[in-house]
């Protein structure tokens, strides 16, 4: 059985404590390493190979055009077909739309999945982060090339999804 090779690109967001409110808690009380790489290597030990690249570590509301251009360059330069992007949930949809336009313009045949979390991946007994990350990684086996958001057990095209803040879910 062929192993999937996945290129993970980190943009920040709550999933890794890059959120002003959660950062204060972590900095003062917890001091946890909530990185995706630590989570995958120490807790999951997956049956696929991956590499990780950090483009930025920001609250998604602070992501700017320069960050998006760096993300586009990272996607274009990787040889991997499967690309997972961890991202804050506030502007994830905007980034996904940007990437749809980018891969169409560049004629790239890649599977790009964005995911994030409402609660950080480490430090809380209840978090959606591990589930969202696992669901996203498994989704590479069934998706066609394109850009998707994987959140709350759903796989969405950017134009078909909204973040519902009251319900803490994408729908």
Q: What does each of the following model-derived ranges do?
A:
Residues 2-171:
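Active-site histidine-anchored catalytic micro-motif
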